[in-house]
């Protein structure tokens, strides 16, 4: 049987969601927590919610997801740490199948292209819900 893969993941912050501290990440998707727009104090246009990830390093599916086990959270969560499309990065880092950039959905509904050369501090800041 072949299951569909998830090429879009929720943003957990800039910490690796596979690590225990990743559950309490600074992003919008955090284990067993809910956030509303009022919690995104940076402004909706500044907070990344969903982005591309190819699943080349961590084949995944939204079906039957469970947070326990090896790479559990990383199957549906991504994080913004080093930069997009870095070949040597962790499997939870964002990447795409097209060269040069990734597409990111922000909390206000706009989609933005983020280039591979984005400044690391900007890349990390877009992944957190509050300053």
For the regions a protein language model found, what residue spans apply to each?
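Surface-exposed loop/linker segments characteristic of extracytoplasmic
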Residues: 1-131
């Amino acid at each position: 049987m072949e299951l569909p893969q998830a090429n879009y993941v929720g943003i957990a912050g800039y910490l690796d969601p596979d690590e225990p501290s990743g559950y309490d990440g600074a992003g919008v998707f955090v284990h067993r927590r809910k956030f509303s727009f009022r919690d995104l104090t940076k402004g909706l246009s500044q907070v990344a919610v969903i982005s591309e990830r190819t699943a080349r390093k961590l084949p995944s599916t939204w079906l039957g997801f469970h947070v326990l086990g090896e790479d559990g959270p990383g199957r549906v969560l991504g994080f913004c740490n080093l930069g997009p499309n870095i070949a040597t990065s962790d499997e939870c880092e964002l990447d795409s199948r097209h060269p040069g950039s990734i597409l990111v959905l922000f909390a206000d509904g706009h989609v933005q292209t983020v280039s591979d050369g984005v400044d690391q501090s900007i890349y990390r800041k877009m992944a957190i819900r509050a300053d």
